[in-house]
């Protein structure tokens, strides 16, 4: 893990220097924009440099359908403000998203054409769909799309994608900057960059900003628009550190689901009708213990952790149950390989928290949390079926292009030989 080093310049100056260096070195540049406070400040800073240089940059906003109306209004305002200097990519296409508030629909698809009558809102005019991107396959995951977008937009040139994450937000985001695994995967040794595919780099210009820095920037630049939903969050008493925007049903994002019916009741009613489990999720997500699987959990009287795990599995829909059983088998097999002939009922909590020991209690906690990909067991989310479809289509296109190129060269050689023969005659 990298060591934090302090410098004698402020974070605003440092961010501007990173942006200048990026513009100096990359031929193609795009901004991944969400409408949140961090990406808004980052976009203002990037556009400041783009306008100064007279360069156009692409702005990618992936619309998840389930968004605050205030966020959509802010996106409109930002796109209009910088319309002369951006290439807009407001993307509304079916994407598979996590739904952590129910076992009956553990994933939902935004902009699902089969559920058009239940859409939370209509697509905005001029938005882009899967038809605008040759790599797009309906049902792709968000994380897969953004990587492929960078590769497609770069067209083989050196490309930078500005990402507005901050290390303060989570350990995962801190590791995106500080981990030693980035060795050889940065641009020019800059730890605020990450190589994601060939000749495409993520750039994190505000990674060292604190939440207070974000709002200090807006206080000093009142002419720069910000998302008005944060003003409503302040009025609702939400702490600055807990003010997050994203699709509302994810494993972490669901904690803010209750805010919708307070801040935007008109949007809330549509969310409840659109996504399974939205209402119950908002009611219980602030609870602890067995209701959500957070903090200390207990087993029913007369049950072991193993029998409680099996009881929880039996209450689930077959498809969801089969998914967890397959994941648990992988978990148990992995620990068998490390010398555990049997899985203990429980282990010291500090070892369980660090994933250093297996236990049936850990499996129960995964089920109670609706941890669909079993990240609490040290497992990761696999590539989606849509991504596999894209890979097959890409390989088929490349093979066809290679075949056509071979045929073209073959015809050129034949014509050349014919021309030479006629010249001799």
Residue map of PLM features:
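Nucleotide-activated chemistry modules centered on ATP-dependent adenylation/adenylyltransferase
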Residues: 1-32, 37-425
């Amino acid at each position: 893990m990298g060591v934090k080093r302090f410098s004698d310049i402020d974070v605003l100056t440092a961010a501007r220097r990173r942006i200048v260096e990026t513009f100096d070195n990359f031929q193609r540049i795009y901004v991944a924009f969400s409408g949140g406070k961090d990406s808004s400040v980052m976009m203002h800073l990037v556009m400041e440099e783009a306008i100064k240089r007279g360069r156009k940059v692409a702005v990618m906003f992936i619309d998840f359908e389930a968004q605050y109306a205030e966020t959509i209004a802010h996106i409109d305002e930002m796109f209009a403000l910088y319309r002369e200097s951006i290439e807009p990519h407001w993307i509304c296409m079916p994407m598979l998203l996590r739904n952590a508030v129910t076992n009956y629909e553990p994933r939902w698809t935004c902009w699902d054409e089969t559920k058009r009558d239940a859409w939370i809102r209509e697509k905005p005019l001029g938005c882009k769909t899967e038809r605008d991107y040759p790599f797009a396959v309906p049902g792709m995951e968000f994380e897969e799309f953004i990587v492929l977008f960078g590769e497609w937009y770069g067209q083989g040139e050196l490309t930078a994608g500005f990402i507005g994450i901050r290390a303060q937000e989570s350990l995962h985001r801190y590791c995106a900057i500080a981990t030693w695994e980035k060795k050889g995967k940065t641009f020019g040794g800059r730890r605020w960059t990450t190589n994601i595919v060939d000749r495409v780099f993520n750039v994190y210009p505000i990674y060292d900003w604190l939440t207070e820095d974000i709002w200090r920037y807006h206080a000093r630049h009142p002419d720069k628009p910000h998302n008005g939903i944060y003003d409503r969050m302040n009025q609702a008493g939400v702490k600055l550190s807990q003010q997050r925007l994203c699709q509302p049903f994810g494993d972490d994002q669901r904690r803010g689901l209750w805010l919708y019916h307070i801040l935007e009741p008109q949007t809330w009613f549509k969310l409840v009708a659109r996504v399974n489990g939205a209402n119950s999720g908002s009611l219980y997500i602030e609870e602890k213990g067995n209701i959500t699987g957070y903090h200390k959990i207990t087993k029913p009287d007369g049950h072991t952790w193993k029998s409680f795990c099996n009881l929880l599995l039996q209450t689930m829909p077959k498809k969801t149950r089969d998914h967890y059983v397959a994941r648990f088998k992988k978990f148990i097999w992995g620990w068998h390989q490390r010398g555990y002939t049997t899985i203990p009922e429980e282990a010291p909590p500090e070892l369980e928290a660090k994933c250093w020991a297996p236990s049936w209690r850990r499996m129960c906690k995964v089920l109670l949390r609706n941890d669909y990909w079993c990240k609490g067991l040290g497992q990761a989310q696999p590539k989606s079926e849509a991504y596999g479809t894209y890979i097959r289509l890409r390989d088929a296109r490349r093979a066809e292009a290679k075949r056509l190129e071979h045929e073209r060269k073959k015809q050129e050689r034949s014509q050349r030989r014919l021309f030479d023969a006629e010249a001799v005659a």
